[in-house]
Amino acid sequence: MLETYTDFGFYCFIDRLVDEENMTANDNDAFTRVIHKLERLAPLEQADRDAIRALPFRIKTAPPNHYLVKEGAAATDCCVLLTGYVCRHKTTSSGDRQIVSFHMPGDIPDLQHLLLSRADHNLETITEATFALVPAEDLRRVAQQRPLLAEALWRDTLIDASIFREWVLNVGRRDAKSRIAHMLCEFAARREKAGLGPPERFNLPMTQEQIADATGLTSVHVNRMLFELAADGVIVRDKRQVEITDWSRMCRVADFNAAYLHEAA
């Protein structure tokens, strides 16, 4: 197996070039989580799973707060997140950031690269993250050959759009406490669907600054709202660990209805 160190101008990381002949059993399992996700979106056949596992890919690991994709870059690959958390964000000409989504293992956060030639957003790690880069043309070819896989990828894109619509509502119309509570509920629900643990207790990977940039608030306001949620008795916080003590009440505070997730991870 070939290992090289590659500097893309953003950071230096290990690039493992993988092909079918030298793929290990561990490498072959790289797509297990994303396959499980896609199976919830369409009734995949064994041939669909085999086609996904046969895709060429490169494994990369990046530290926190580093760009995987920069807005305007050529869109040649699709990123399958294996471990860790990343966010999508846009920035104004003056450098102000708006986080537009969070992503977790099993997600393909830049699936639009199947058809779009340029990235229209930034993709940045929140934690250390490991991901597989799949050439977009190879994934597009397999999707054209496997209708059920194409259906699953299309549904994933539609659910992504549904989540975007909910985020617009969250930032535009909910009060500060509801925004924070809603973000926590969504994160917990998506983690559970992704098989990452129960929704009632989790480690929150986002900083208060990142939460602020996702909810249109300041870090100070986020901190105050987290304290209020704890004072209300709906969450217990221990540094990064969050426990939702009353899920039904938390959902009422958040105005949270998981229907917009369409049972997606």
Where do the PLM segments sit?
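Cyclic-nucleotide recognition modules
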Residues: 101-166
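Phosphate-/nucleic-acid-contacting segments
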Residues: 189-265
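Alpha-helix/helix-capping structural signal
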Residues: 83, 137-138, 209, 248
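Cyclic nucleotide-binding regulatory domains
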Residues: 66-128
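Cyclic nucleotide-binding regulatory module and flanking cytosolic helices
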Residues: 5-64, 108-109, 114-115
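Short aromatic/basic micro-patch
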Residues: 59, 102, 133, 205, ...
